[in-house]
Amino acid sequence: DFAVMENEYGAVNVDGDLLEQTNDLNIWELTEGCICCSMQNDFATSILTIANTVDPEYLIVEPTGVGMLSKIIENIQKIEYERITLLEPLTILDGTMYDRCMFEFSEICEDQIQSAGRILVSKMEYAAENERCSLKQKLIALNPEAEICVSHYTEQGDDWWASLLTSYLDKEIPMKEERELDLENLGLTEASLQSEQELILFLQGVVSGVFG
């Protein structure tokens, strides 16, 4: 049982429309913002909502191409518990645009490569062997731990595709350490939340057992 969450940095989600036409899937769309920053509260709320209502075995998140993958992983890890577990992130890279993207958007491009567990290179099936090898070496230099596939996706066997659903993320994204207070009880005055979305996220976390 699969559900798909699409995040497009714009008002129109073309990929979501195509998926709805060709597959019997639950499609969730988040547009006009990026789930790694401006929409991170909506993103976390949506994941908890999907987990508690649709309850799919797998939720595929396709973020916008201008998103920071490390931030997206961090946002999910904040709400991760026994029913929400991260698989290895897969970055799909347009091999023909690599040099241009690294020149114009180096921070985003490097983050998406370095945070991935697997990197699948697209649009290089007609490139010369030395070009593919050169690109692979550049990717290895940025992320030596990732599995890098420069051959066309149709050349990947069934075992490879199946392993996408069984390979779990085994590395933590560094987060700021918070000092624990050695108190039996804690009282807060004038506590507030910035939005209704934050309240919904907090309440869903309580119901789901995220806080113990």
Write out the residue ranges for each language-model feature:
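Nucleotide-state-sensitive switch-loop elements of NTP-binding domains
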Residues: 1-101
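Phenylalanine-focused residue identity feature
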Residues: 2, 43, 103-105, 202, ...
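Short, ordered loop/turn segments at secondary-structure junctions
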Residues: 7-9, 124, 153
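Residue-level signal for inorganic ion chemistry
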Residues: 8, 62, 116, 122, ...
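Conserved short-loop catalytic and cofactor-binding motifs
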Residues: 31, 60, 123, 186-187
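Conserved C-terminal guanine-recognition region of P-loop GTPase G domains, centered on the G4
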Residues: 50, 66-148
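C-terminal accessory "lid"/substrate-recognition subdomains
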Residues: 111, 115-118, 126-212
